[in-house]
Amino acid sequence: MNDSEFHRLTDTLWMTIEERLDDWDGDSDIDCEINGGVLTITFENGSKIIINRQEPLHQVWLATKQGGYHFDLKGDEWICDRSGETFWDLLEQAATQQAGEAVSFR
């Protein structure tokens, strides 16, 4: 994968997250902001999830209250380089915990 393809894939990932949060109708207030390739999700309780791209490594990094995760693209999925879990699974787990209610991105 070259840098332009990596940017296209991560831009698509960011847009998907933003669209899902815009459509979300849960009880909690969840805000999403994209700035300089960094996506920040802010929850009503003040906690945050930070997602950014690591261009030199062609990885997506996810920082949550539970810890940090690094994802490599394998086929069509971003997969954690330690646990083997998918990006969407770990993001949903963290968002659900930090929002205090179920949050789905799929």
UniProtKB/Swiss-Prot annotation:
Any Pfam family: Frataxin_Cyay
PROSITE patterns cross-referenced by the UniProt entry: FRATAXIN_1, FRATAXIN_2
Cellular component GO terms held in the UniProt record: cytosol
Keywords recorded for this protein, A-Z: Iron, Metal-binding
GO terms, molecular function: ferric iron binding; ferrous iron binding
GO biological process, one term: iron-sulfur cluster assembly
Transmembrane regions listed in the UniProt entry: none
InterPro entries: CyaY (IPR047584), Frataxin/CyaY (IPR002908), Frataxin/CyaY_sf (IPR036524), Frataxin_CS (IPR020895)
SUPFAM superfamilies for the chain: Frataxin/Nqo15-like (SSF55387)
Keyword Metal-binding: yes
PANTHER family to which the protein is assigned, alphabetical: FRATAXIN (PTHR16821), FRATAXIN, MITOCHONDRIAL (PTHR16821:SF2)
Primary role: Involved in iron-sulfur (Fe-S) cluster assembly. May act as a regulator of Fe-S biogenesis.
NCBIfam families: FeS_CyaY
Family that this chain belongs to: Belongs to the frataxin family.
Protein name per UniProt: Iron-sulfur cluster assembly protein CyaY
Species for this entry: Citrobacter koseri (strain ATCC BAA-895 / CDC 4225-83 / SGSC4696)
Lineage, opening ranks: Bacteria, Pseudomonadati, Pseudomonadota, Gammaproteobacteria, Enterobacterales
